[in-house]
Amino acid sequence: KTTDEMLEEFSYLGEDKAYEVVVTNPRHIADLVEEIELLPPGQLFPPRLENSEEDLNRLVWDKCHELYGDQPPQLIVDRLNVELGSILGKYDVVYMSAQKLVQRSLENGYLVGSRGSVGSSLVAYMSGITEVNSLPPHYRCPKCRHSEFITDGSFGCGADMSDKVCPVCGEQYVKDGFDIPFETFLGYGGGKVPDIDLNFSGEYQARAHRHAVEMFGETQVFRAGTIGTLKDKTVY
């Protein structure tokens, strides 16, 4: 209720006493309450996953070499180095926990949809969290791993490019790349906290929750949700 409504409720006490009860006393109580910070500002306290930093780094570079060869194009190397520099040692647990949840779901036959800005992270793609390749539009050969990047702005994403065969081995090229900057995810300088949203199958979701409990422990995992309500005047 508003202050005026509360004053009306206590009007039987008289104007001065009602003001004391509704305004003066609550303000006095509020002044007695000390402001405290439950957690130090600007710090994160992520859970621990053994070898998460080493595992993420290994997964990313193994997948990079699998797709783009033993000597991948420099723009890929530069992009991964920038991303990993912002992630390793700070957010590797976030990535590896998501990777483990996605991998377990896929092993059980259920696809996982990643949504939001995580698609702009090449590390997320190389580690198997998302199917969105954030590199510029390009062709890549699944056989000899030769690649050609289109960086003149003529295409917004690889899916729009014409079909083409690899000039090295004659294999049909894979068209890939959606040209999304990493800053969309972690901001300039990697200052944002990563938020990885994953959509699991309704049939599998409870099992994904149990897997999270297995990773971190019963007392370290909780559900966050939204409760929707309707006012009685709009319900018929």
State what each model feature region is:
Residues 37-47, 148, 186-204, 210-231:
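Conserved alpha/beta enzyme-core scaffolds, especially Rossmann-like or related mixed alpha/beta domains
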Residues 141-144, 166-169:
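Short cysteine-rich clusters marking metal-coordination/redox-active sites
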Residues 134, 138-139, 162-164:
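Residues immediately within or flanking Cys/His clusters that coordinate Zn2+
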Residues 136-142, 189-194:
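Interdomain boundary/hinge elements
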Residues 105, 109-131, 213-236:
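Conserved phosphate/anionic-ligand binding catalytic regions in large, soluble enzymes, centered on
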Residues 12, 28, 32-35, 128-132, ...:
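Short, well-ordered loop/turn and helix-capping segments at boundaries between secondary-structure elements
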Residues 11-111, 153, 159-163, 169-191, ...:
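Non-catalytic structural connector segments
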Residues 2-14, 153, 191-198, 222-225:
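Short beta-alpha connecting loops at secondary-structure transitions
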